[in-house]
Amino acid sequence: MAPPGSSAVFLLALTITASVQALTPTHYLTKQDVERLKASLDRPFTDLESAFYSIVGLSSLGVQVPDVKKACTFIKSNLDPSNVDSLFYAAQSSQVLSGCEISVSNETKELLLAAVSEDSPIAQIYHAVAALSGFGLPLASNEALGALTARLGKEETVLATVQALQTASHLSQQADLRNIVEEIEDLVARLDELGGVYLQFEEGLELTALFVAATYKLMDHVGTEPSMKEDQVIQLMNTIFSKKNFESLSEAFSVASAAAALSQNRYHVPVVVVPEGSTSDTQEQAILRLQVSNVLSQPLAQAAVKLEHAKSAATRATVLQKTPFSLVGNVFELNFKNVKLSSGYYDFSVRVEGDSRYIANTVELRVKISTEVGITNVDLSTVDKDQSIAPKTTRVTYPAKAKGTFIADSHQNFALFFQLVDVNTGAELTPHQTFVRLHNQKTGQEVVFVAEPDNKNVYKFELDTSERKIEFDSASGTYTLYLIIGDATLKNPILWNVADVVIKFPEEEAPSTVLSQSLFTPKQEIQHLFREPEKRPPTVVSNTFTALILSPLLLLFALWIRIGANVSNFTFAPSTVIFHLGHAAMLGLMYIYWTQLNMFQTLKYLAVLGTVTFLAGNRMLAQHAVKRTAH
């Protein structure tokens, strides 16, 4: 540990938390992400569609394809003048390639104009209108708008509506595009919110990105601010840039288009504020360095950064406010060394100004200022319980170990006193973790106590063997005393071997060896005690109940004897005999179930008896019916 009075060293650890004013971006394109996106778009052309995604996607990122002439030749050689989609890809691609002009015949022009019809799907109308616009051919915007509006009534999917927005951005500004613009609000209502951070269509990221790009392109075209809240824009941004690797060209193209729209439109430019360097950078001076950029990690040239206020996270006291950052290269810096902040956490509220388009431009930064802790006034004492002998006190200086041993027994207590100070400022410190650990040199047993400061911030630990015997299991011996100091804001956590302490407990309270030896011996067997069966009713009650149950049967026999039983139609055919025997067997099975069987056993037997009885009874009744018909 550096001695007191050494030069101050601050440790800045920075994290961004959500601003209370607005949602903070959690995803954006870092410089590495932008290069990865460019690599995803820079692929060999396989057809006109892939060429369109590569050429226009790279153009959105401000990059030309490596070989413009070769790309133009590929477009011309693969163009099908009789296909609207082919014409769309060629027109949009050639438009961003310098010096790539494609001549169009009258037949092709008529083909494109004919495709702008309410009988065509919206995708076809979009491709035709964009192709006419790309080739610089005249277009009746009102007629195209009428066809587009008519088709919107028939196609209500999210994709069709987004393509309608894309189409409208190619129409004349004099056309009444209000109905198309109103579709933006309807699309926003169809977005799904995830955890208050993300906003997307259930169709996925690609369509969400195309919606953002189409919305801002159309709003720039008509000169109207989009009907989206700032938080919704940030949620859409978080969704679009949450993915860093792309499986298809079309997905990479959609993300590039959305990134260009969010960084260059006339209404909303999300601000990305990133602390420079790692969150564990050590600085010789207390300097907060911030990189301020758009979603493409491009520096905002017009930005002006200002500290609104800095508050202690513990006390909420304001320690700094209304302080501008200075621009050094592309980094904004705030030097607050002169403020001499004590160690701890501080909440810095930073605002980016300079352009009315900036959104998410107020962020909260959690700044951790670390320091070094010093241990002073360390006293080790043995205090007589009867106070008949004056305390023996020994002062120790960190990191040395106290000479000799200290004794704590039934006659005297052991005490440790110390103070913790900030090495850089001399201020008193109260770290979160201040422990005293006693380690038995023979058995390895460890006992840990918390050291608490008093009202003067003097830490005290006192060991009374009569009160602490439970924690030690009354195990006497020589213990090594360690002092442990730790805190998230401390640069130098401390583990200090302070002294050796001999602790003696009364012999009769020594730890039981029987307990330790019996840990792995068989335990006494646990005998399960079943619940006593419930008392059965007296035999008289049971017999009376049985007689009542059988009384209807006795009555039946008595009536048969008196009026006679009609058995004239009884035959001794096999089906008749089997039916009656089966019926009797089922009644007998019920008795056996009552006395011996369980439900599942009974059901198996009953299934066999029931099947035989049913078949025999069915045969018996059929024979009886035939016999009655014959008579």
UniProtKB/Swiss-Prot annotation:
Signal peptide segment: 1-22
Major location (coarse): endoplasmic reticulum
Topology Lumenal: residue spans: 23-540, 593-596
Keyword check for Metal-binding: no
Transmembrane domains' residue ranges: 541-561, 572-592, 597-617
Family annotation (Pfam families): Ribophorin_II (PF05817), Ribophorin_II_2nd (PF23861), Ribophorin_II_3rd (PF23860), Ribophorin_II_C (PF25147)
An annotated GO cellular component: oligosaccharyltransferase complex A
Highest rank taxon of the organism: Eukaryota
Cytoplasmic compartment segments: 562-571, 618-631
A GO BP entry: protein N-linked glycosylation
Biological role: Subunit of the oligosaccharyl transferase (OST) complex that catalyzes the initial transfer of a defined glycan (Glc(3)Man(9)GlcNAc(2) in eukaryotes) from the lipid carrier dolichol-pyrophosphate to an asparagine residue within an Asn-X-Ser/Thr consensus motif in nascent polypeptide chains, the first step in protein N-glycosylation. N-glycosylation occurs cotranslationally and the complex associates with the Sec61 complex at the channel-forming translocon complex that mediates protein translocation across the endoplasmic reticulum (ER). All subunits are required for a maximal enzyme activity.
Family: Belongs to the SWP1 family.
PANTHER family, per database record: DOLICHYL-DIPHOSPHOOLIGOSACCHARIDE--PROTEIN GLYCOSYLTRANSFERASE SUBUNIT 2, RIBOPHORIN II
Protein name per UniProt: Dolichyl-diphosphooligosaccharide--protein glycosyltransferase subunit 2
Organism of provenance: Mus musculus
UniProt lineage: Eukaryota, Metazoa, Chordata, Craniata, Vertebrata
